[in-house]
Regions:
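Conserved GNAT acetyl-CoA-binding A-motif
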Residues: 105-123
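Conserved beta-strand in the GNAT
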Residues: 54-65, 78, 83
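Non-catalytic, surface beta->alpha helical segment in thiol-disulfide oxidoreductase systems
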Residues: 228-251
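Conserved catalytic-core motifs of GNAT/GCN5-like acyltransferases
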Residues: 116-117, 132-149, 232
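Conserved acetyl-CoA-binding loop-helix of GNAT-fold acetyltransferases
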Residues: 84, 90-105
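A conserved beta-turn-beta hairpin within the catalytic core of GNAT-like acetyltransferases
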Residues: 67-79, 89
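A short, internal acetyl-CoA/4′-phosphopantetheine-binding micro-motif in the GNAT/acyltransferase core
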Residues: 80-89, 119
Length: 251
């Protein structure tokens, strides 16, 4: 049977699941925060395309100019997430989703498509080895993070200068996050409790405007962690991962 795909729109957004957290029967704060965030982003050309099934199979991308990441460039798409999880894996859905994004970019006369990668694959980033099969290449770096790009016209985007700073003045734990990922709110609350119980100094910065995201002091997709002023990871972490970071082991 041919797969059916759905693009979220202002009309269907209230009633469609958002893939990442679909097993809960009650309203989930992170999902509803993401839904509200998407309601504004869809007006800017943001795309959330998913399999018409109760599964985690989707791609999410936006015009780079309005993507909430410290990456600069003109006329590009930025991919936030491409995720195929569980039983649907191995059926070619990831390839079809990527191909649909690239087709959209070409149809709109875009200069290309970019996404965040790293020297070592991060758990909370899309599979960069998969992207490279389509011709994505590293065009810029910020520490161990890479800007992967498929250019159609020879132009390339780049990390904002602030993203290469990789330091903040705060001590202890510092986290920046957006509502782009529905897991963020719950993760923040659990980390906040963990730090309070152990008397760990912690600051959590909810990024709520595009201009904030565009000037963040590190590579960023929807989450960033600093410890004692030094950038650690874009992975969403729990208490155990924080303890490793405190022991100077990066995640």
């Amino acid at each position: 049977m041919e797969a059916k795909w759905i693009d979220l729109t202002p009309e269907n957004l209230p009633n469609e699941h958002l893939c990442c957290i679909i097993r809960t029967k009650s309203a989930h704060p992170g999902v509803e925060a993401k839904r509200a965030w998407l309601a504004e982003r869809l007006q800017e050309g943001h795309v959330f395309r998913k399999l018409d099934a109760k599964q985690c199979v989707f791609i999410e991308y936006a015009p780079l100019e309005t993507a909430w990441v410290p990456v600069e460039g003109e006329n590009y798409f930025y991919i936030y997430c491409l995720w195929v999880q569980g039983a649907p894996r191995g059926q070619g859905f990831g390839r079809r989703l990527m191909e649909s994004c690239l087709a959209d970019a070409r149809a709109q006369g875009r200069s290309g498509v970019c996404m965040l990668g790293a020297q070592k694959q991060k758990a909370w980033l899309s599979d960069q080895s998969f992207a490279r099969k389509f011709g994505f290449q590293t065009v810029d770096t910020a520490g161990e993070y890479e800007l992967l790009t498929l250019s159609f016209d020879g132009s390339v985007p780049h990390f904002a200068e602030s993203a290469k700073q990789q330091t903040v003045p705060q001590r202890g734990l510092t986290v920046f996050y957006t509502d782009q990922c529905p897991y963020s709110l719950q993760r923040v609350e659990k980390l906040r409790e963990f730090c309070t119980e152990r008397q760990i100094e912690a600051q959590f910065y909810h990024v709520t405007e595009l201009k904030q995201a565009k000037t963040l002091p590190c590579a960023f997709n929807n989450w960033a962690v600093f410890w004692n002023g030094e950038f650690q990871t874009v992975n969403q972490i729990d208490g155990a991962a924080l303890e490793k970071i405190m022991g100077r082991k990066k995640t």
